Amino acid sequence: MLILAGFLLLVSTMTNIEAGIKVPGTIIGTGTKALLGGDLTDPEDDGAPEEDTNYNAKFTSSDEPGFGGGEFAFNVFDNILGPGNDKWCCGLAGIAEGEGMHITAELEAPHLLTHFTLSSANDVPDRDPTTWEVQGSNDGEKFTTIFSYDGDNLFTDRLQVIRFDAEEDFDAQTTGYRFFRHITFKTANWPNGAFFQIGEIEYFGTPADDTAVDPRSKLATQWGILKNSQ
């Protein structure tokens, strides 16, 4: 009986990942080299975060908008995993109940999300999202949940890249969206201290209709600087 009780106690204190229970996502590696690259926000991987140009998306966030800035929000789209200005950390005033910390990428045309990656930052695992969603919208106001997670920390390492696929980790999409938003509702640290951080986000998909803009045409995040790619 004592052996059984000890085993049950051990199991009860293990995370789903440690216990080998199926969790969403596939770990594909660590560090910048593990990023897939060429996502919808920057198909050519030539975005210039210092100037906020050469992106195919306009970015907005609930807090700390901008690249650089001392761990500002847009750093999750800089195509680099690392400390400091290569991550978004740590929020200014806690995560408001039901509101969340969110960052949105606005594309020029609707896309069907086929897969995405989410990466941990360089330190403090208790800042990793544990309750979070990826959402889509076509007006930037009303968002529909595409993927949701509420559970143990999915990351097992720092600067780790996890891939999430349609039909495996979330439903195959039949509606295309122009806006894709990542929103965090809870971390292990919430609501205490420096509670939140993300390393990188990548979104991938197919045009929702035949009128979608050629991804080789680069649009700055300020909308209007068009660069023709050969």
Per-segment meaning from a language model:
Residues S12-G20:
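Bacterial Sec-dependent signal peptides at the C-terminal "C-region" and cleavage site
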Residues V213-Q230:
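Short acidic, low-complexity intrinsically disordered linear motifs used
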